[in-house]
Design a protein with these regions (language model features):
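C-terminal active-site subregion of NodB/CE4 polysaccharide deacetylases
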Residues: 67, 73-172
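Metal-dependent polysaccharide deacetylase catalytic core of the NodB/CE4 family, i.e.
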Residues: 1-111, 149
C-alpha cells in the first residue's frame, strides 16, 4: 500500500508540472521507471458497470470531477477551468446518464483551488449545487460558500478517533 508520505511526494511532483501538458510529463516520468501508470489507474478506478450499480444505491451520491485532474489554479485562464469541469460533466452524462449536482476539486487545497475556481463553479449553478475541496474539517456555519465546502481527505493515517474530533464541532 502506498504510504501517505509517498502519496504526498507524488502529488507534489504532479502539481509542479505544466498542467496543460501533464499527461506528457507523467508519461516521461513513469516510463523512465518502467511503470505503467494507466494499469494502476484501471485497477483502482471504478468501471462504468460499478458506477451504474452505485447509481442505484439510495445512500450514494455520485459527484463530478474534471476530465484530466489538473491543478485548476495552475491553468492559465478561467475558461480552461470551465472547459475541464464541463468536459468531466459531459463524460458522466454520456457514459452513465448521470447529472451530478456535487463537484469535487482535484487535489482541493487552497493551493489548487481558490476564489477564481470557486467563482467559475458558482457560474455553473445550473448544473451544480455545491463543490467540495480537500482542506479538512467539517461543514460549519463558517462554510458559507457552497462552492468551496471543506471535506476530509481520508488516508490510512486517519483513525476513528481522528474522525470523532470533527463530530464535536457544530455542523449545519
Amino acid at each position: 500500500m502506498l504510504s501517505s508520505y509517498a502519496f504526498l511526494k507524488i502529488r507534489e511532483i504532479i502539481l509542479k508540472q505544466d498542467q496543460l501538458h501533464l499527461y506528457d510529463s507523467l508519461n516521461q516520468l513513469f516510463n523512465a521507471y518502467d511503470i505503467d501508470w494507466f494499469a494502476k489507474s484501471r485497477e483502482l478506478a471504478l468501471s462504468w458497470d460499478e458506477v451504474q450499480k452505485l447509481k442505484q444505491e439510495k445512500l450514494v451520491t455520485l459527484g463530478a470531477h474534471t476530465k484530466h485532474h489538473y491543478n485548476l489554479k495552475a491553468l492559465p485562464d478561467v475558461s480552461d477551468v470551465i472547459d475541464e469541469v464541463e468536459y468531466g460533466y459531459k463524460i458522466l452524462e454520456n457514459k452513465a446518464d448521470l447529472h451530478p449536482v456535487v463537484f469535487a476539486y482535484p487535489f482541493g487545497s487552497i493551493n489548487e483551488a481558490d476564489k477564481r475556481e470557486f467563482k467559475a463553479l458558482s457560474s455553473m449553478s445550473d448544473k451544480f449545487e455545491l463543490a467540495v475541496r480537500a482542506c479538512g474539517g467539517p461543514v460549519t456555519n463558517l462554510s458559507t460558500d457552497y462552492f468551496a465546502l471543506p471535506r476530509i481527505m481520508l488516508t490510512e493515517d486517519y483513525t476513528y478517533l481522528t474522525l470523532l474530533r470533527y463530530k464535536k464541532i457544530c455542523v449545519i
